[in-house]
Amino acid sequence: MKIMITISENSEAKELMPIAQAVHILVNKLPVAMRSKNKPGVRLEKGEVVDTNYEGYVLKVAIEKGEVVRATPIIGPYAGLPVIVAPIKDGDNVLGAIGVVDITAGIFEDIVAISRRPELYKFLPEDAFPK
């Protein structure tokens, strides 16, 4: 049996759920939120769906800009916590966005600055090593 997951600008929470759940598991159940461009989405925490009508201000910003957004919201369930949100694109068309609470905010830069271990260069992108 073949199953296909399709995401569009108008996908609803239930259509986004399989991808959001997979990412949630991949990031060790950190809070994950996902929405389409035109409809509210889903929010997951601790392995559970906690919201199926999630608007997400930072998700909307990433959709509008069409680029990754790192921010610390001042309102909403993640107020005061750093988040990272990536747009979901089909070419130049932004279909939605997915984000995660970024518990790593700043620590990688600190670790790299402290260690400056050259053997790490082959595993990390260029911008991970500010010069």
UniProtKB/Swiss-Prot annotation:
Keyword Transmembrane: yes
Pfam families: DUF2111
Transmembrane segments: 68-88, 94-114
Cellular compartment(s): Cell membrane
Membrane topology type: Multi-pass membrane protein
Keywords, in A-Z order: Cell membrane, Membrane, Transmembrane, Transmembrane helix
GO cellular component assignments: plasma membrane
Presence of keyword Aminoacyl-tRNA synthetase: no
Protein name (database record): Uncharacterized protein MJ0405
